[in-house]
Amino acid sequence: MQTTVIGIGETGMGKSSFLNAYLQKNAFQASDSPDSCTKMTSVDSNIINNQTRKAIDTPGIKDTDNTDQENVRQLVEFLLNYADGINVVAIVLNGQVDRYTRDTEKFIKIAHQMFNHPDFWEHLCIIFTKWYSGMNEEQKRIKQEE
């Protein structure tokens, strides 16, 4: 069995880090910087407990390098070929932001339009990242060494 997750969200939210954790390997370049790491939609996979996990990393909306239109165009083009194989749409949000924004609503609407599937809501997952940012320096060092 194969489970495929696509990460969607703003630049700097932790999409690549989340997908690396899901795959249990460093498949995608990730950093704590608010600048974009992901330039193009990319795919990687790993076999964990005899189950194939596939992850799709996407450039962020509000990207620091490309325009939103270019990133959305790139994503739509990619999805035309792969949308049927995606099991989970993960909207990745910064857990330190304490409110729901219009941008969050926009991401969910864009994802819903892109997939245009009657069961979309059953496959949507909201992921909150960056909880570790409240750690002191020693805790961060230990976390990075893990």
Model-derived features: where do they sit?
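Conserved GTPase G-domain substructure that encodes guanine base recognition and part of the catalytic core
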Residues: 1-146
